[in-house]
Amino acid sequence: MRIAIIDLGTNSLRFDVYDVYDDEEFSLIHREKFMIRLGDDVFTTGQISDKVMDRAMETFDLIKIYIKEMKIKETFAYATSAMRTADNAKKFIKKVRKKIDVD
């Protein structure tokens, strides 16, 4: 089975794709890093700015294409402190979930 893991950090988004085998072995088949700078305004204003949100959504548009073309079955995401701190994190998560099917 092919899975993707999205690591949404304060400065970058890392997108990794793995093939996972029945014997619980796995292999990394794709790794990409995008500089979306999610935390640019979060630590000063408490909000993910519209500009940063738009930049992130452009990245998720590309990730959506990767998910389809690479035949990824499941996508998992986790985020670091910028997302936990942002007052509008729920809005951001809702927009991401509209773009891609993610847990």
At which residue positions do the language-model features occur?
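Primarily the dimerization/phosphotransfer
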Residues: N11
